[in-house]
Amino acid sequence: FSTVPGSYTPYPGMHMQFLSGPAVSVQGAWFATPYWGFGGRMSCTNLRVKVNGVAQNDNLECASMYAGPYFSHPFSMRWLVGAKLLGGCEIYKPCRTDFRRLERRAGFSFGTGLSTTYLATQNLGVRFSTDYDVAPPVVRSSRERLHKLTFGMEVCAVF
């Protein structure tokens, strides 16, 4: 699931709070060495919205594509620790609120993440991850970037 801590003020008098919601992502990396690789992540997130303390009927839907370096280090026969540093694009679909409609928006974003992977078999793992993304403002006139925190558990192929 994904969450956006804090509150944001895209327009004067409009205080927005984004509540946790589901996130789905696909990611992969090619490792040129056992430790360093290059890869990417595509994700979709659906965040519930409150404006001035009132829950809204519409949700903020986001899609993103990132690419960058990945790092992996085995610390036992079955456990790996990993990290990544990514840059890319975040896209917001239009979102209706009681206060004002938020238009479609896209912009540069960057993120990082940490993970631990347990190798259940030689080629199958279970990964626990935490990602932190800095996404563009929800409106063009705002300078407040969204700070997204995503916690995940994944089944992954390791080869």
Specify the residue positions occupied by each region the protein language model found.
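Membrane-embedded beta-strand positions of outer-membrane beta-barrel proteins
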Residues: V26-G28, F38-G40, A67-P69, A83-L85, ...
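Detector for outer-membrane/organellar transmembrane beta-barrel domains
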Residues: T3, T45, Q56-N57, A63-Y66, ...
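Extracellular loop and loop/strand-boundary signature of outer-membrane beta-barrel proteins
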Residues: T9-M14, V51-D58, C95-L102, P137-R143
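A generic hydrophobic-segment detector
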Residues: D98-R143
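Repeated loop/turn-to-beta-strand initiation elements of outer-membrane beta-barrel proteins
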Residues: P34-G40, M77-V81, Y118-V126
